[in-house]
């Protein structure tokens, strides 16, 4: 069993009826990058080997139990749309769970929204694609606004 789950006292659960033996343990606290041989090979083959250290650190983050929990929370607590405030004023506000905001913040901090444009070079798109692949395994929904931001720059550059 997973050490994180085993550390919880069994008496905490009043319905201690049986031991679950037909399910695998939780996949967490591992390095998503170094644990993915195909991804590591693709990054090397396509010119992103310079980013392997950074990708390994990012893989530790995305594979951690606490970070995976953010993805669970972002999906469990769906966005809420408020049309009016408590005084009846129209606000049209979408409220997201704080976990969603943390996922967005991390995406931006790690350049998923723009890194090949802000730091161009050989393998820049490969490194960004690998980070995006790792991060969307945690939670994919936040990838839409991140990808739209990333995709907007080439279009904007075509404008006179």
Model-derived segments and their meaning:
Residues 96-160:
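Glycine-rich flavin
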Residues 1-121:
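Extended, charge-enriched "interface" segments that sit outside catalytic cores
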């Amino acid at each position: 069993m997973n050490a994180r789950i085993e550390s919880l006292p069994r008496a905490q659960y009043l319905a201690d009826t049986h031991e679950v033996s037909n399910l695998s343990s939780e996949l967490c606290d591992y390095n998503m990058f170094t644990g993915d041989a195909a991804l590591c090979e693709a990054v090397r083959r396509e010119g992103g080997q310079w980013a392997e250290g950074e990708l390994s650190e990012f893989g530790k983050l995305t594979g951690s139990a606490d970070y995976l929990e953010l993805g669970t929370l972002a999906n469990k607590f769906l966005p809420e749309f408020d049309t009016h405030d408590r005084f009846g004023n129209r606000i049209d506000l979408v409220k997201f769970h704080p976990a969603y905001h943390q996922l967005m913040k991390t995406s931006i901090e790690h350049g998923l929204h723009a890194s090949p444009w802000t730091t161009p070079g050989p393998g820049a798109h490969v490194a960004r694609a690998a980070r995006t692949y790792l991060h969307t395994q945690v939670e994919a929904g936040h990838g839409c606004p991140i990808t739209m931001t990333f995709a907007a720059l080439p279009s904007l550059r075509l404008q006179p």
